[in-house]
Amino acid sequence: SLVVTETCLPVKIFVGQVLNLIEKGVENIFVPSIQSIAPKIYNCSKIRGLPDLIRNVVKKPFNMIEPTLDKSQKGQGLYQFLLECVQPFGIVDMERIKKASKTGWRVYNNFQVMLKSGMPYEKALKNAISGKLLIEKDETEYPVSIALVSHAYNIYDERASMKVIDKLNKMGVKVYTAYQLTEEQLEEGVTSLGQEVYWANEAEMTGCAGYYLKDNKIDGMITITAFGCGPDSLMLERVTRKSKQFNKPLLNLTIDEHTGE
């Protein structure tokens, strides 16, 4: 009821998370403005303007930590972004910030390694935060393999996806996502669809789909998109056309706040 109907589900969920944190007594809430993650690679308008959106719809008092990341602009790199994150707490020592950044990257890289090995998302995240690096292979034999194409916030948010991976596994389906692929494989997938990257996180959609469409071990593909997402609708159109060329079955699922099991 706080945002207009056309707002996509992930942003509505974010607004709900902010309200939930405020109700729990959290005073400082991280609401970044991610403009661009690489030169000329942009986010959607809702993510770029997220702090303004939250400021206008959430009227309860709290302190918003709102750093800006815009790698299309000079002087707006990662360390400047991190400085803006911690400056409100009186931390301005760049050496301290860089040291913390390197520690964070190690944890993130370990998480990526475990995820690519096939470890479930939550388990990989828990291990990484605990400082562990474990390689786990799923030895279960599945009669069917599909590629689940979407963004992490759609796949791994249980309310948004309704535990779609668990449901598919119970049906005897092996699930592959973008997060088992390397950056090189995702870039190869984007190229195979005959397009260039313009949107942030586009590789999760077109890169993932393009790579798995050529993979003979993949029997079919499921895409999950949020209703009202403009960038995803453009990417999905290209994926749908290419799936017909590769003769791969494709199921398009669109989710919103009314989605039920």
Task: Report each predicted region and the residues it spans.
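An N-terminal assembly and electron-transfer interface module characteristic of large anaerobic redox
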Residues: 1-261
